[in-house]
Amino acid sequence: MKQKNIDEMYMHRCLQLAKNGRLLAKPNPMVGAVIVSSEGNIIGEGYHVRYGEGHAEVNAFRSVRPKDENLLCEATIYVSLEPCSHYGKTPPCADLIVRKGIRRMVCGCVDPFSAVQGRGIEHIRKAGIDVTVGVLEHECLMLNREFIVRNTQNRPYILLKWAQTANGFIGYSHITSDRKATLQISNAVTKMLVHKLRAEYDAILVGRNTEELEHPRLTVREWNGKNPQKIVLSSTYKNNGFVDDVLYVNSLQQLIDTINQRNNTEQKICSLIVEGGAHTLQSFIDAGLWDEIRIETAPFT
């Protein structure tokens, strides 16, 4: 097997491991690490389990059995994201790799965080360790797209989501005496997937019309997970702020500013779902404030 194929095989394992930290590693990135002996055996592996605790590299080295410690000098460590080079809640992983005397490091992608940005790779190379960067780079970047957007664009990762009929209608509210009767596009399976998605995101936003007509809870009910922060957007609101745990904002700029302010203090909103309605979704599209769009299309018109 060619070295390129070998590197990709172990990087795939890093990505598998990294995904285990999806819910608890935030606001840190998801990272996986695998240590492979010169004979091609995995002697250690780990992932970043929880924010504030050991990084993937630390956990991978901890998993190495005492009898295999002597193999590290000829081993290769695979890591999906560049090792950190600064002191934060934990010491630099780049220093740890150098101390362990690893022969080679294979890195999926460079960390865009301003305190790293290639410094970890440079430090390891200066120590005489062979470094390969960019193995499965696209997959590694996509895994942490929320982290990357937050650190490069200073805003949360924004997903626009809607359900529509086969001929492109998002749906409508037929106003009756009770002021609410909505066209139902989703089914039981897609509802479950929607709730799974909510559990993976930090906040969810709707416009004033949707809020007043439907009063959506926007909670996680058909999946296990934490409820996202509910946000309502309307240009008619005079004041911004929280009312009964719901955040009300009157502009897109105010939305971003409020989220950034809260991220600097307590609540970390790294990702946002925008569920509509149509006017609200269009405002995000017109402003270029989106990273991903997911559309559920019904088989009827």
Where are these regions (language model features)?
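Short, flexible loop/turn motifs enriched in small residues
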Residues: 25-29
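Flexible, acidic active-site loops/lids enriched in D/E/S/T/G that coordinate Mg2+ and/or position polar
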Residues: 57-79
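Short beta-strand scaffold segments in enzyme catalytic cores
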Residues: 31-40, 162-163
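A short, polar/charged loop-to-alpha-helix boundary motif
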Residues: 50-62, 180-191
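Zinc-dependent deaminase
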Residues: 1-24, 67-69, 73, 87-301
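Local cysteine-cluster metal-coordination motifs and their immediate loop/turn environment
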Residues: 47, 54-57, 77-96
